[in-house]
Swiss-Prot record:
Record bears the keyword Ribonucleoprotein: no
Protein name: Protoheme IX farnesyltransferase
PROSITE patterns: UBIA (PS00943)
The species this protein was found in: Burkholderia mallei (strain ATCC 23344)
Protein's GO biological process: heme O biosynthetic process
Membrane topology: Multi-pass membrane protein
Catalytic reaction equation(s): heme b + (2E,6E)-farnesyl diphosphate + H2O = Fe(II)-heme o + diphosphate
NCBIfam families: cyoE_ctaB (TIGR01473), PRK04375.1-2 (NF003349)
Upper lineage: Bacteria, Pseudomonadati, Pseudomonadota, Betaproteobacteria, Burkholderiales
Keyword Cell membrane part of the UniProt annotation: yes
């Protein structure tokens, strides 16, 4: 008698939810919401906030489901991803396609109903950039997959900004640039301590193709560039002292991790740096939000 939970409604729901990579989706949606609030000096209209958040989240989940479908054989060979229901064969190809289509359709309809055409097209372009260009073309072909493909993953703040204003001005692109430059060191520290996984799966990640030392150097270089780029919101006048102080402190710790990885690497250190990189981006964007509403009050 089969006593597993794989056929219960709750476990089936959790399997489908896992396809959307909830933690990654949450971070993407969080950055999009910050983009919405930074786009206006007041409050975001609740219909735009709700519709934009749900629509962007659904389309992001749809793209991640396609990623799981395309990479199910690769995921099955990697310890980090072998647990995914797609890799374990617990959900069929047709079911994943149907699930992704429903999510994508609902997301596009929600954005059409509550936002504007620019937001829809930008979000769909982001979907194609991640699910097709990155997943199918870049990731299995070049060690620069993260650098080039990071453009689609960096778009959420621009999507949020467009949802509110119907435009994507320079300040929104600064936010995109921050995530774009953050992406390589974030993923490369993961690739360092998961190098064997990527090697076994045949993926040309930087540590596999160019070695550990080369990757460690580039993590440091990109983290230095990231520190400089995070000064741009203050330099452009978009943010004030609250953000600047936060960016300097958060960036200094990220630089310390990158320097330590370069000089005295260990897998345990890389794991801590990877976890911190997620906290770093979340707190950096939270600081942008706090500064946005605190600045008129404190005058800094």
């Amino acid at each position: 008698m089969d006593t597993t939970l794989s056929h219960t409604p709750g476990s089936r729901l959790s399997q489908y939810l896992a396809l959307t990579k909830p933690r990654v989706t949450q971070l993407a949606v969080f950055c999009a919401v910050i983009g919405m609030f930074l786009a206006t000096p007041g409050m975001v209209p609740w219909k735009v906030l709700l519709g934009g958040t749900i629509g962007i989240g659904l389309l992001a989940g749809s793209a991640f489901a396609i990623n799981c479908l395309v990479e199910q054989k690769i995921d099955a060979m990697m310890r980090r991803t072998a647990w995914r229901p797609s890799a374990r064969g617990e959900i069929t190809t047709l079911q994943i396609l149907a699930f992704s289509t429903v999510l994508g359709g609902l997301g596009a309809w929600t954005l059409y109903t509550f936002t504007n055409p620019l937001t829809i097209w930008l979000t769909i372009a982001t979907f194609v950039g991640y699910a097709v260009i990155y997943t199918l073309l870049l990731k299995p072909m070049t060690p620069q997959n993260i650098v080039i493909g990071g453009a689609s993953g960096a778009m959420p703040p621009a999507l949020g900004w467009a949802a509110v204003t119907g435009a994507v001005p320079g300040d929104a692109w600064i936010l995109v640039l921050i995530i774009f430059v953050w992406t390589p060191p974030h993923f490369w520290v993961l690739a360092l301590y998961r190098r064997k996984d990527y090697e076994n799966a045949g993926l040309p990640m930087l540590p596999v193709t160019h070695g550990e030392q080369f990757t460690r150097l580039h993590i440091l270089l990109y983290t230095v560039i990231l520190f400089a780029v995070t000064m741009m919101p203050f330099i452009s006048g978009m943010s004030g002292a609250v953000y600047l102080t936060s960016a300097v402190l958060l960036g200094a710790l990220f630089l310390a991790y990158a320097w330590k990885i370069y000089r005295d690497y260990s897998d345990a250190l890389a794991r801590r740096a990877f976890r911190y990189s997620i906290v770093y981006l979340s707190l950096l964007f939270a600081a942008l939000l706090v500064d946005h509403y605190a600045r008129p009050v404190i005058g800094m």
